């Protein structure tokens, strides 16, 4: 996971560098950073949490997503101590913040910002459905994760508004 995340960081750093001349450094870094966080979210959530998962028998595989909102979540996770719900919120904050900051330079930013946050929510739904379909990765599909991810994206969107007001990407090139 770490190697894939670092390799993709190198790629998106080059993308930001290439865009910075045309869009300004704030927008270039924000948009490339948002794309990188979306890739890292996929890496974190669609690879097995532990290697050697083995085979998940069809009989023990879930047929549907858990609709038990706030149901049992582990107390900790290897990346971040605390609750898994806190982690699910935290991982979507950067994507929401960077997206809003990245589109703030354009007049259509007021339309693009909420559209991007909706897409982040749909991305969370897609991740959960893939976790359901790919039983071999031994992950669970849970509505609580979607709610927490959307909450994180919205918090990030609020942070992105504040960052846009401070950094004013529309004034820099």
Where are these regions (language model features)?
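Bulky hydrophobic segments
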Residues: 1-138, 158-173
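Non-cytosolic membrane-interface motifs at loop->transmembrane helix junctions
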Residues: 137-148
């Amino acid at each position: 996971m770490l190697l894939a995340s670092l390799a993709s960081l190198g790629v998106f750093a080059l993308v930001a560098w290439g865009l910075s001349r045309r869009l300004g450094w704030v927008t270039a870094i924000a948009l490339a950073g948002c794309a990188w966080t979306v890739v890292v979210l996929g890496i974190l959530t669609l690879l097995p949490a532990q290697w050697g998962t083995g085979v998940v028998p069809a009989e023990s595989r879930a047929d549907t997503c858990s609709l038990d909102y706030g149901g049992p979540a582990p107390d900790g996770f290897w990346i971040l101590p605390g609750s898994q719900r806190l982690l699910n919120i935290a991982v979507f904050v950067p994507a929401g913040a960077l997206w809003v900051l990245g589109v703030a330079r354009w007049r259509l930013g007021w339309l693009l910002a909420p559209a991007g946050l909706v897409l982040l929510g749909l991305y969370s739904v897609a991740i959960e459905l893939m976790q359901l379909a790919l039983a071999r990765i031994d992950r669970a599909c849970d509505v609580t994760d979607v709610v927490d991810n959307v909450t994180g994206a919205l918090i990030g969107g609020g942070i992105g508004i504040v960052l846009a007001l401070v950094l004013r990407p529309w004034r820099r090139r």
